[in-house]
Amino acid sequence: MKAAIVGASGAVGQELMRILAERNFPIDELVLFGSSRSAGSVYEFKGKKCEVRLLQHNDDFKDIDVAFVSAGGGTSKDFAETITKYGTVMIDNSSAFRMDDDVPLVVPEVNAEDALKRPRGIIANPNCTTIMMVVVLQPIEKLSHIKKIHISSYQSASGAGAVAMAELQQQYKELIETGEAKTISKFPHQLAYNVIPQIDLMTDNDYTKEEMKMFNETRKIMHSDVRTSATCVRVSSLRSHSESVWIETADPITVEQVRKVLATAPGVTLKDDPQKYIYPMPLESAGKDDVYVGRIRKDLATDNGITLWLTGDQIRKGAALNAVQIAEYLIEKGDFKIV
């Protein structure tokens, strides 16, 4: 089996290489692609040197079984036909195709079977905040239909990329040395010692694109009429996103029921003993595969409400790991010929 990573030099591309090696993903050859800036770079994968090729409109994907694409929406749209024309399965981390009717939007713990229906040869990876939330919501949905969700997200600097993370570190340095953050480029305001209640551009309804992704993607993934209202906030941590989630169900459910289903849910680690200061924090979820969940409690404002807190590594489960799990599911179902 032959796999490719498009955008190999980026944060998600690098994480993909680590995860493919960690999980002993069954490939004979890994091919790396990138822009003119990264072409020629060399990375090691399972003891072998892999040189990044320039991504071009040619036949380079002819013998590739699966391509993990993490190079931005523009590149995904531009190269989708080139990547898929010979039957390569394209697992795309951008937002380019997520809401297309003929492209499945997949979180394996929730709707893995959707990946088998892909008329264009493309499977979309959801937004990182959506992925982490629906992994936790799906077991609760089995207890009672979820009608409404309110979310406040606390999203780390690395969610905006490696350059954004470096900018945050530079701001802290400047503040310590001069008392003023002079480097403000990736964010609309100083992020160091601050929070910014805007991620992505504003839409006509005064929600951001990030917030609308959570509304639309959750419904598509869960095949549900659930209504989601989000406020997405950039915080000055480096890695892992967190979410405060309020859930209203059709029928009453208890905190004990929720804890029980989440304790055994795939992809979830339950950390919920706040009297002993045990609850999820982004610092400990960084570099981990699971979504951590805790602070589960009965909502005081509605009879059928549950409130909880979750955190997870947005580069791993929020992007790279989810993509690899999709490919693993296709292998399990016999979609690839393993040599």
Give each language-model segment a name.
Residues 1-191, 227, 260, 291-292, ...:
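N-terminal Rossmann-like NAD(P) cofactor-binding subdomain of oxidoreductases
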Residues 67, 157-339:
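Charged docking surfaces used in two-component/phosphorelay signaling
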